[in-house]
Regions:
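Ribonuclease/tRNase effector modules and their secretory precursors
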Residues: 1-141
């Protein structure tokens, strides 16, 4: 006969990302980017777009965590040197996730990385600098 699985291991690929999920991801991103003096913020539009049907396949919390972890490892210092009002796009070539962001200097002089939106799109075009990565190194997990 057919075995019924105890848990749906692909559940998060269909489940929408909740505000509470994004809050946890933001805390994680804040912790790692604090090393280069950057605070991470998500816009309201980011939350709307993370669950958008145009992504074709749902963007998962683990993909967003990977996006921040890998972009920090490859571009953390570079991002911190871009300066106030700089705009760029973080691009994960493995998952085709793109995250346009802007850097703002707060009144306290801290740099804030504001993730404007997020989308899963192959060959994403932007006039801003594209910070791409593909390789996923497991040694820091």
């Amino acid at each position: 006969g057919q075995y019924e699985p105890i848990a749906d291991l692909n559940a998060d690929e269909k489940k929408e990302v909740k505000k509470s999920d994004l809050d946890q991801i933001e805390k994680y991103a804040d912790r790692i980017f604090a090393a280069v003096g950057i605070d991470v913020e998500f816009t309201r539009h980011f939350l709307d777009r993370v669950n958008d049907a145009r992504n074709i396949k749902q963007i998962t919390p683990s993909e967003l965590t990977r996006l921040f972890k890998q972009s920090f490892k490859k571009y953390g210092k570079k991002i911190s040197k871009l300066g106030d009002d700089a705009q760029a796009v973080i691009n994960d070539m493995k998952t085709n996730i793109n995250m346009p962001f802007v850097l703002n200097k707060t009144k306290g002089g801290e740099l804030e990385l504001v993730a404007k939106t997020v989308m899963r799109k192959k060959n994403f075009k932007s006039s801003n600098t594209k910070l791409s990565f593909e390789n996923y190194s497991k040694e820091t997990e």
